[in-house]
Every structure is written in C-alpha cells, then in structure tokens.
C-alpha cells in the first residue's frame, strides 16, 4: 500500500496541536508569564512563537516573505485564550492549504516564487517540507512548555 503523506501530515498536525492545547490549558495565570531564567521564554512567548512560525510558513507558501518578528506581530492578544484562538486560526489555514492539494502536489515546488524567497529558503519551497518544519518547530516548543511546567513542580508522568 502506498503511503499517503498528506494524511500523515494531517494526523500529525492534529495530534501535536491536541497535545499543545492539553498542556497549555493547564497553565495557571501566574505561570503564563514566568521565565525559567531571564533570558528564556515564558509560556506565553513560546505559544506566540509557535503561532508566529505557522503564520510565517503559511505566508511563505502564498509566495510572500515576511520577517519572523512581523509574523509574530500578527498574533493578536495577550491572554492565553486569545493566543489559543490565534493558534487555531493559523492551524485552520494550514489544514485548508493541505486539503487543497493532492498528495503528489505536496511534493511539487511552489511555482512563481520571487527569487528573494528562494534565496531565503535556499531553494524551492516544497509544501510537504514546509509543513513538516511547522510540525517539528511546534513539537520542539511543546517539549519546552512541558519541561518548564515540570520545573514548577508539575510532573507530566503523574498528572
């Protein structure tokens, strides 16, 4: 049976987001802006970065290059629920993009990209690879959120 990478991506996008929401929903208000060290990101900062990355990738796949801080600035709201809503909006856009493509189209370079985008990405943008980057980035920061909560006394193996 031939593997369907599109279905794999959809499953993984749903799974990692489910884990992120489960973890984020346990964050208490005093923990939301807590920094493990002054030079480290708070839970809020990590959630904004996760969302900003997805906004950045989604914008890139539309053939537009924006700076990372510009993508993060598009994440509106200060409280946890507002940022979770922004994460949901970005994920819906990613899933809509995926659903508009066949499995094969996900491996075709995005056409007619400006040269500055190709230069930035160091070549063609393959949608499957870009979405896989989004997944890897989100899962990495989910681990940080879990670890940061562990530092505050929440053992994920005993919750």
Predicted segments, located by residue:
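Extreme N-terminal tail/first-helix region
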Residues: 1-12
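Short linear motifs at secondary-structure transitions and domain/linker junctions
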Residues: 8-10, 22-24, 108
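Short, contiguous alpha-helical
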Residues: 10-14, 21, 29-73, 114-159
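Hydrophobic alpha-helical core bundles mediating ligand binding, dimerization, or RNAP-core interactions
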Residues: 13, 17-20, 24, 87, ...
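Short alpha-helical scaffold segments that flank and stabilize functional sites
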Residues: 26-27, 56, 93, 97
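Acidic/histidine-rich alpha-helical segments that form the ligand environment
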Residues: 76-112, 125-138
